[in-house]
Amino acid sequence: MLILPPKIEYVIETLQKNGYEAYAVGGCVRDMLTGKTPHDFDITTDALPEDIIRIFEKTVPTGIKHGTVTVISGGVPVETTTYRTEGKYTDHRRPESVSFVKNLREDLSRRDFTVNAMAYNSKDGLKDYFSGREDIEKKILRAVGDPQKRFYED
């Protein structure tokens, strides 16, 4: 079992109490699984940006077009992003468009590497649809999906 900081747990639990899914996601999960202390925590949720803003008292619409709202939890900024899929990357960095989805697996499938495509909350545990934990144990860096497409995007 992984232990999330109380301010991160608060954001996740608040979203859950309001009927939404929410997970710590990406590098923070990878770092915790490897015994490192994460420097920042990102949250992914099926709540839409306007729902996140409605639920939390202090927010900043940092990347609203891409579904990202920064929730200020006890003075700590926590990037909270709606589950999404992404359109084409014409500049190799940012997608031309994003579409919000209601499925965690679909959101995780857009991520670069399996070790970054894991999500965690204390209620549901680790969500690892692409064998990221196994890849960490084997010290393998593997792309999610088509490697050429992933490297073209990044």
PLM features per residue range, with description:
Residues 1-153:
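Catalytic cores of the polymerase beta-like nucleotidyltransferase superfamily
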